[in-house]
Amino acid sequence: MDEDTRLRDGPVPRGDEGQRLHSGEGQVRRSGLQGPVAAARAAGTGVYAALDLGTNNCRLLIACPAGDGFRVVDSFSRIIRLGEGISTTGSISDAAIDRALAALSICSDKIRYRRARRLRLIATEACRAASNADGFRDRVAAETGIRLEVIDRETEAALAVIGCSPLLDPQGRGAILFDIGGGSTELVRIARDPDEQDAVPRIKAWMSIPLGVVTLAEHFGGRDVTAQSYAMMVQEVAQYIAPFAAEHGGGLRNMHLLGTSGTVTTLAGVHLNLPRYDRRRVDGIWMSDADITATIARLLGMSYRERANNNCISVERADLVLAGCAILDAIRNAFPLPRLRVADRGLREGMLVEMMREDGALGGCR
């Protein structure tokens, strides 16, 4: 992400009763830094850091307030596949732990170098599911100084909404937001009244399913995907989504899909025929239903090697992208909306906005 990228501050989404969604598991540890890295927080600078350790990716965003949004001063993203094999073994592998520690050490160095004073450092599905997650987090704290907060799925959905709400169509009545992760997928129905000035988006309903690109690809195979295996993936996801769609899939007029995930950003890059992935070209673009169908068909027609050689996919995503497309197709079938807005933003941006609002800091760097 470019250092001068500015993201507008969107309204805080609230639930049916006007209450912000929150973690309901009082026993989870809060995030933070310890050891030598803690000195960065004590320095008192106006810099914020948000880290998202997911099942597939490790992502960091460091920013300071700028007007009604924030200015990114540093970032990091690396595919580490922390959740590789968890669906069969139940634990994080030694190789995955080593990959995560290497990435988190870089994040720790960046946080210290940028003297971030306000931090939120979260972990998601892999650390919710793995039997050795506590030991892994203890080792992360000991070796990198990063103390991870394992968030629940409700909090994950709420942060995605905060991060992506600036991309809601201001003339629309809301969206079906989805976040396709490595080990889980979140769906949120967001409502807004376009006739109200400064209409605040509200979370009407949400759900999370324990399927993501890593778990689905491990179960059905991600390298050599046939029409039959692809259809089976779509059907598997559809079974999880069906009850939510039956209850919350009506009255979709003047709404759109809003997707945040490596799947949709990759799909957008391929759709645009980009020579290499470019966030500035992808974040916020609209794709029609026909665009999505054509691009997925194009990917299904590629071999694993062809996908790996595409610079918007690369070898890191070549065995996962079709599993993500299957999840997207299941969502499209359940919520047949004509447009998708693509978001290259999400949990990190949500954490930054939330922290800055809590501090009353949306007014510039100190």
Residue ranges and their predicted role:
Residues D2-V47:
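Non-catalytic pre-domain segments flanking phosphatase-related domains
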Residues T5, G15, Y48, I62-P65, ...:
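Helical "lid/coupling" subdomains associated with nucleotide-phosphate turnover
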Residues A43, V73-S75, R137:
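Local beta-strand/beta-hairpin segments that build beta-sheet-rich folds
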Residues G44-G69:
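N-terminal basic/disordered segments at the start of proteins
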Residues D52-N57, F178-S184, T260-T263, G346:
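A short acidic Gly-Thr/Ser loop motif
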Residues N57, S75, A175, G182-E186, ...:
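Broad gene-expression machinery/nucleic-acid interaction feature
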Residues D68-L82:
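N-terminal glycine-rich anion-binding loops that anchor highly charged ligand groups
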